[in-house]
């Protein structure tokens, strides 16, 4: 998942709601074609999480779970222990889903750029979407820098005859 989020605000929302667990999600209107096999949240009208399931492409509008949880450490440890008793293959979303009827689990909508990288096609599409300045501006905010780029490699070299349009080029490339 690629997105920018102010976690202090998200934590405060969690504290104010007094929920046991808060999950971050992005509402999308292209889930039939995109986000296949990503987890989705089924919410009630109060944004309470009723279940977590896989997106099978059966509906256009879905709430894509962004794999972001907020809960107390003690609850997290308890969930891990419960999951381990069931199976070593049991995942955190599965144990949270199994307890959705017992715990107060809330969903909080994310606003802004969001990309789910699940295969080469989604990786390509996410990168190409960042060519648009408005899209890139939604992710790359000077007040919230993203530190992912190394600064010790040589810049890209554009050799004679190179023609580049609508491309995302990493440093250290020869074109």
Language-model-derived ranges and their functions:
Residues 74, 82-175:
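Left-handed beta-helix
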Residues 5-83:
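Conserved core of the sugar-phosphate nucleotidyltransferase
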